[in-house]
Amino acid sequence: MPKQKTHRASAKRFKRTGNGGLKRFRAYTSHRFHGKSVKQRRQLRKASMVSKGDFKRIRRMVATMK
């Protein structure tokens, strides 16, 4: 059976944390900031953790990632 490969697109978007979680960055941050408040733009800059519902699926895609 061949070795499982890391899903490269996912590997670029997620980083593994020290406790084994997955860190992600937020969507809606590339353009059209005039419709967003300063508070919303500031909060979008922060990283976030992958939700519990998505974690299992994403973990399989980046299983071999360090």
From Swiss-Prot:
Which of UniProt's keywords are assigned here?
Ribonucleoprotein, Ribosomal protein
Any GO BP? translation
Q: Which GO terms describe its cellular component?
A: cytosolic large ribosomal subunit
Chain intervals for the UniProt region annotation (Disordered): 1-21
Spell out the Pfam families in the cross-references: Ribosomal_L35p (PF01632)
Task: State the SUPFAM superfamilies in the record.
Answer: L35p-like
> Entry's InterPro entries?
Ribosomal_bL35, Ribosomal_bL35-like, Ribosomal_bL35_CS, Ribosomal_bL35_sf
Q: Where is the composition biased (Basic residues)?
A: 1-16
Q: Which domain of life is it from?
A: Bacteria
Gene Ontology molecular-function annotations: structural constituent of ribosome
Q: What's this protein's family per the entry?
A: Belongs to the bacterial ribosomal protein bL35 family.
Which HAMAP family does this UniProt record tie to the protein?
A: Ribosomal_bL35
Indicate what this protein is called per its UniProt record. Large ribosomal subunit protein bL35
Native organism is Lactococcus lactis subsp. cremoris (strain MG1363)
